[in-house]
Amino acid sequence: MMSFRFAATFAAILCVSTVALSPIAGAEAPKSLSSELKAADGTSLGTVTVTAAPKGALLRVEAKGLPAGWHGMHFHEKGDCSDAKFANAGGHVHRGDKVVHGLLNAKANDAGDLPNVFVGADGALTVELYSTLSSLDGAKHQATLADADGFAVVIHAAADDYASQPIGGAGARIACAAFK
C-alpha cells in the first residue's frame, strides 16, 4: 500500500513538473536570422545567427578557415557583402550622426561594437555573445539591425583596441555575413 501511494505521488509530481517546464502554449520562439559567413574570395567559412532577445541581440558564430588570433567583430549598417573588401557593408550600426567608437571609450555611442573574438590555431571560431547596444527591431531605443537595407556581421584582420577611431585599429575586413 505504501509503495502505491509513493508511486502515485511521484507520478503526480512528475506530471506537474513536466507541465511547469513546458513552453507556454501559444508563445512564439524569438525571431532568429542566419546567414553564411564568407571570406573575401567568396569561400564559405561558416554561419552567423542573430537572435532577438528582450534587451538586445544574441549573436552566434560558427566558422572554420579564419586566421588564428584575436579579431575585432562588429555589426555593420548594410546587409551587403558583395565586394571583396566588404566596403558595401558600410560603417558600424549606429543611431546618431557622429559615431564615437570603443567599448572602453566613455563617450562611445557606436552600436555596432562587439567584443573581440579568438580564433584557435586550427582556424576555428565558435562564439556566442550578447549585445545590448543593438537589437533586431530597435526596441528600447537601440540601433535597429533588421531595417530596410539589412545589416552585416564583419570580422576584421586584427583585434579591436576598444578606443581608437574609427574602428579600434581592427584593420581590414576579412569575413562578412549579410542579413537582408
Give residue spans per PLM region.
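Bacterial N-terminal signal peptides that target proteins for export
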Residues: 1-12
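Short hydrophobic "helix-edge" motifs at membrane interfaces and signal-peptide entry regions
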Residues: 12-13, 65
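Hydrophobic h-region of N-terminal signal peptides that target proteins for export
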Residues: 13-23
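N-terminal leader/targeting pre-sequences
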Residues: 21-180
